[in-house]
């Protein structure tokens, strides 16, 4: 990860299920400044759709989604 892609904040939402990951992601983004990066870790498969929908709904940029061993990593720019 390059320096420009280093997250300003990380959320560990492993073990949480809907609606907690979306709620906590929205809450974190509301507390962040424009242009900052948020990294979210989750393992609820519903987050694949829910986080993408949240990003579209609130107008933030979903930079990447990666999956490894059932854990998802979302990188979001506010």
Please annotate each region the language model reported.
Residues 1-2, 36:
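N-terminal pre-ligand scaffold of iron-sulfur
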Residues 2-12:
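Right-handed parallel beta-helix/beta-solenoid
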Residues 13-66:
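Amphipathic, hydrophobic secondary-structure cores in small proteins
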Residues 73-78:
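Core SAM-dependent methyltransferase catalytic element
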């Amino acid at each position: 990860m390059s320096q420009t892609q280093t997250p300003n904040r990380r959320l560990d939402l492993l073990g949480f299920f809907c609606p907690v990951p979306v709620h906590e992601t929205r809450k974190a983004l509301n507390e962040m400044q424009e242009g900052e990066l948020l990294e979210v870790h989750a393992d609820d498969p519903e987050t694949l759709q829910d986080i993408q929908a949240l990003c579209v709904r609130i107008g933030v940029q979903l930079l990447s989604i990666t999956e490894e061993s059932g854990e998802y990593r979302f990188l979001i720019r506010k």
